[in-house]
Amino acid sequence: MDHATLAMILAIWFISFHFIKLLFSQQTTKLLPPGPKPLPIIGNILEVGKKPHRSFANLAKIHGPLISLRLGSVTTIVVSSADVAKEMFLKKDHPLSNRTIPNSVTAGDHHKLTMSWLPVSPKWRNFRKITAVHLLSPQRLDACQTFRHAKVQQLYEYVQECAQKGQAVDIGKAAFTTSLNLLSKLFFSVELAHHKSHTSQEFKELIWNIMEDIGKPNYADYFPILGCVDPSGIRRRLACSFDKLIAVFQSIICERLAPDSSTATTTTTDDVLDVLLQLFKQNELTMGEINHLLVDIFDAGTDTTSSTFEWVMAELIRNPEMMEKAQEEIKQVLGKDKQIQESDIINLPYLQAIIKETLRLHPPTVFLLPRKADTDVELYGYIVPKDAQIKYLLTYGLLEEILMHGKMLIFFRPKDL
């Protein structure tokens, strides 16, 4: 059998399979939330566009705050209003609490080793307990306030030095270096980068590659039957990126565990890594779980913060009168020479409004991780079918603007907040 004949047989089988599946699914179509009519085979893929959150906000104007789409062979429900989200999270949380696993995050069994993608289970509850008690407790966050201030001061001194030398400042790189060092100091008691080195740029590119690959459209997500062949090559690239990032963490962990190391566990540094290694010794965590937990935290905690900061500065440079107003507010509240403290932020409402407006226009992430219906669930008067994926649009404020004004307000306007 030649390759052309084999390809034709596979294509006929593939089309027939999805046609039969479509016929059987038409019985429940009337119960689904409203949405645009899907095309054969590809469904509504073409209607998503390059900016899905804006596409979904526009679709919500036509079809309402709960939309059903068919992306390839996958039924997708988009939640785009606070009212629907409240019903989903407060009343229907249990049958909608598990995750739809994108094909890309199965790289290196990442979905089995991290709290983000695990189903509700004893293992997931243990991860959640460890995170709440040891990583994000008020005591832990209060304890690191001093070096948070030190890292911000370090950023200030770097920018001041560049200004004195007449050098341009790469805002994204500077913010990323600060975010990276805040996390690495909290977790490892070391700084992983320096403002004048290329290390932070390399780390940033690695994190960006991971975030980009996870967020890319993937044929294997639209047609799960293709998952085993990884048609877009995303899973392979992501596995490589995971390995590079884990290698960084493993070098730090091995140094900590080395008997002759000055930072070995016999010497208590009282950082998060010490806690994780203690849990490892007590068989509460495996080394793989520690590595992939660190991957999640450093992915989520560095790129999102630095990209938001970069957009804040971009909008202020684009709107000099707003920058001047923010500077004036800081001078009035703090005086000319006092350095800003975390406790001062509550007295800077215009600065807070700038941050909120930046997050409205340039959200670092527009969707929560996708959920999955374990069974047919009634939501907002409609049926969410079993195995449908649920996407929650974090920027549902876009929808509210459309309903109020008939269009999205894309101008930077912190004074209205």
From Swiss-Prot:
Q: In which pathway does it act?
A: Pigment biosynthesis; betalain biosynthesis
Q: Where are the transmembrane segments?
A: 4-24
Q: Which GO terms describe its cellular component?
A: membrane
| Topological relation to the membrane, as annotated | Single-pass membrane protein
**SUPFAM superfamilies xrefs:** Cytochrome P450 (SSF48264)
Query: Which GO molecular function, any one, fits this protein according to its record?
Result: heme binding
Q: What is its main location?
A: membrane
- Which keywords appear in this protein's UniProt record, sorted alphabetically? Membrane, Transmembrane, Transmembrane helix
Q: Where in the cell is it found?
A: Membrane
Q: Supply the InterPro entries for this chain.
A: Cyt_P450 (IPR001128), Cyt_P450_E_grp-I (IPR002401), Cyt_P450_sf (IPR036396)
Check the record and name the PANTHER family matching this protein.
CYTOCHROME P450 76AD1-LIKE, CYTOCHROME P450, FAMILY 76, SUBFAMILY C, POLYPEPTIDE 5-RELATED
- What the protein does? Inactive cytochrome unable to convert L-DOPA to cyclo-DOPA in the betalain pathway and producing a yellow mutant phenotype. A frameshift replaces 108 amino acids of the active protein found in red beets (AC I3PFJ5) with 27 new residues followed by a stop codon.
UniProt family annotation: Belongs to the cytochrome P450 family.
Entry protein name = Inactive cytochrome P450 76AD1
The source organism is Beta vulgaris (Sugar beet)
